[in-house]
Amino acid sequence: MISSLRGEVLEVALDHVVIEAAGVGYRVNATPSTLATLRQGTDARLITAMIVREDSMTLYGFVDGETRDLFLTLLSVSGVGPRLAMATLSVHDANGLRQALADGDVTALTRVPGIGKRGAERMVVELRDKVGPAGSAATAPAVNGHTVRAPVVEALVGLGFAAKQAEEATDKVLAGDGEATTSSALRAALSLLGKAR
């Protein structure tokens, strides 16, 4: 998986940036606020999430790991794909989104194009306990705040597992072994998911 990119910015468009790293130009989808920090011809570093589908591999870029983790958490909501997750992060910054979820502010969530009242209510129900309070760097309390969680979930999603499935397996592994490393947690989560098939 590609977790971050550093290199020269070749192009900045409305919804993506092209960054050259080791002679290869990578197209990275990003929010307008992230794109506003990038200038053509300068060096940049983005934290990324790589989403692998049957017919595509897409990179999504973020200014920090916290926002990337929030993006991956949004993908766990039924009916929320990468485009809708990016739209949500385009309308709300990480703290604003955390606050809206903590307060159950359906009106704030429906400002996102593509999210209606039902979708906003579902987001509140499914994410309220997974996302920490506004101002918190942890994406969720206890097990979900484990530093190993995000890379393991990202790797599982990259291998084709549903985000919700990946999160549940990872949380189960980390609840049983609080000292797990990224590689040991990934192996254990894959083992769990293999038994479930």
UniProtKB/Swiss-Prot annotation:
Keywords from the UniProt entry: Cytoplasm, DNA damage, DNA recombination, DNA repair, DNA-binding
Domain I: annotated segments: 1-63
One Pfam family cited in the UniProt record for this chain: RuvA_N
InterPro entries (UniProt xref): DNA_helicase_Holl-junc_RuvA_I, NA-bd_OB-fold, RuvA, RuvA_2-like, RuvA_C, RuvA_C_sf
Superkingdom field: Bacteria
GO term, biological process aspect, one: DNA recombination
Keyword flag Kinase: no
SUPFAM superfamilies: DNA helicase RuvA subunit, C-terminal domain (SSF46929), Nucleic acid-binding proteins (SSF50249), RuvA domain 2-like (SSF47781)
GO molecular function, one term: ATP binding
GO cellular component, one term: cytoplasm
Localization terms from the record: Cytoplasm
Region described as Domain II: 64-139
Region of interest called Flexible linker, as start-end residue ranges on this chain: 139-143
Region (Domain III): 144-197
Family: Belongs to the RuvA family.
Known partners and oligomeric status: Homotetramer. Forms an RuvA(8)-RuvB(12)-Holliday junction (HJ) complex. HJ DNA is sandwiched between 2 RuvA tetramers; dsDNA enters through RuvA and exits via RuvB. An RuvB hexamer assembles on each DNA strand where it exits the tetramer. Each RuvB hexamer is contacted by two RuvA subunits (via domain III) on 2 adjacent RuvB subunits; this complex drives branch migration. In the full resolvosome a probable DNA-RuvA(4)-RuvB(12)-RuvC(2) complex forms which resolves the HJ.
Record comment regarding domains: Has three domains with a flexible linker between the domains II and III and assumes an 'L' shape. Domain III is highly mobile and contacts RuvB.
Function summary: The RuvA-RuvB-RuvC complex processes Holliday junction (HJ) DNA during genetic recombination and DNA repair, while the RuvA-RuvB complex plays an important role in the rescue of blocked DNA replication forks via replication fork reversal (RFR). RuvA specifically binds to HJ cruciform DNA, conferring on it an open structure. The RuvB hexamer acts as an ATP-dependent pump, pulling dsDNA into and through the RuvAB complex. HJ branch migration allows RuvC to scan DNA until it finds its consensus sequence, where it cleaves and resolves the cruciform DNA.
Name of the featured protein: Holliday junction branch migration complex subunit RuvA
Organism: Mycobacterium marinum (strain ATCC BAA-535 / M)
Gene name of this polypeptide: ruvA
